[in-house]
């Protein structure tokens, strides 16, 4: 593939923009709390946008179009169900979790929250949460790799 001038200029502008955003964020970050949660000063719109983008990245861009392509428009119920589930999560869980994370030693992660919430001095709940999270991450990456390899190849070599 030949490198064209517009492609090179676009790439350089993109890299410069990313470095600039990183520098501005670095200057406004004073401690680990600022880094991990934005100093708890992000508004509900930014928080919802960030959580939604993190949650929906893989299934929205790969899974949902693939399901609709293979099975037809009847699979659009997936988007409706997931949107409804996210809304219920924000209504029932998010506010209470925000309050409880501050009460439980200013927990910054879900394992830290469970450790503080259940007064786990041996960190059993935190360890268990981390193990489940890592297994889920491995399965997520494996699923992405299978999608990248291609369904025919994956079915032939990995699924039988």
Swiss-Prot record:
Bilayer topology term: Multi-pass membrane protein
Q: Which domain of life is it from?
A: Bacteria
Q: Where are the transmembrane segments?
A: 6-26, 68-88
One example of a Gene Ontology biological process annotation: proline transport
- Triggers of expression: Expression may be regulated by the Nac regulatory protein and the nitrogen regulation (Ntr) system.
| Single annotated GO MF | L-proline transmembrane transporter activity
Q: Where does the record say this protein resides?
A: Cell inner membrane
Q: Which reaction does this enzyme catalyse, per its entry?
A: L-proline(in) + Na(+)(in) = L-proline(out) + Na(+)(out)
Could you state one GO cellular component term attached to this entry?
plasma membrane
| Tagged with keyword Ribonucleoprotein | no
UniProt keywords, alphabetically: Amino-acid transport, Cell inner membrane, Cell membrane, Ion transport, Membrane, Sodium, Sodium transport, Symport, Transmembrane, Transmembrane helix, Transport
Q: What does this protein do?
A: Catalyzes the sodium-dependent uptake of extracellular L-proline.
Q: Which family does it belong to?
A: Belongs to the sodium:solute symporter (SSF) (TC 2.A.21) family.
| Protein known as | Sodium/proline symporter
Organism annotation: Klebsiella oxytoca
Q: What is the lineage of its organism?
A: Bacteria, Pseudomonadati, Pseudomonadota, Gammaproteobacteria, Enterobacterales
Q: What is the primary gene name for this protein?
A: putP
